[in-house]
């Protein structure tokens, strides 16, 4: 009985992992948050201003943000 339960749970777990990763090619199995972050960075383009929490010592902050120069200059 215990062995049957363990086997059923193992099969369900393996099927679940297969279904989750089936949507993405083998080389692109990365976390959803990483894919979202990369997509957001690509959509920004090269840009000529620093976005929030980016350093503002080289580029000026984008409109609506201020350069906080307390410890490390970053846009807030």
From Swiss-Prot:
Major localisation: secreted
Cell location: Secreted
Signal peptide: 1-22
The keyword Disulfide bond appears for this protein: yes
Disulfide bonds: 49-62, 56-67, 61-75
Propeptide: 23-48
Gene Ontology MF annotations: ion channel inhibitor activity; toxin activity
Tissues and organs where the protein is expressed, per its UniProt entry: Expressed by the venom duct.
Coiled-coil ranges from the UniProt annotation: none
Entry annotated with the keyword Secreted: yes
Pfam families in UniProt: Conotoxin
Keywords on record: Disulfide bond, Knottin, Secreted, Signal, Toxin
Assigned GO CC terms: extracellular region
Comment on protein domains: The presence of a 'disulfide through disulfide knot' structurally defines this protein as a knottin. The cysteine framework is VI/VII (C-C-CC-C-C).
Family: Belongs to the conotoxin O1 superfamily.
Name of the protein in its database record: Conotoxin Lt6.1
Protein source organism: Conus litteratus
Lineage: Eukaryota, Metazoa, Spiralia, Lophotrochozoa, Mollusca
């Amino acid at each position: 009985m215990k062995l049957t339960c363990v086997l059923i749970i193992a099969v369900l777990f393996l099927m679940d992992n297969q279904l989750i990763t089936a949507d993405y090619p083998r080389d692109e199995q990365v976390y959803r948050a990483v894919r979202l972050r990369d997509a957001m960075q690509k959509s920004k383009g090269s840009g000529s201003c620093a976005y929030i929490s980016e350093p503002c010592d080289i580029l000026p902050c984008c409109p609506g943000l201020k350069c906080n120069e307390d410890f490390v200059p970053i846009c807030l």
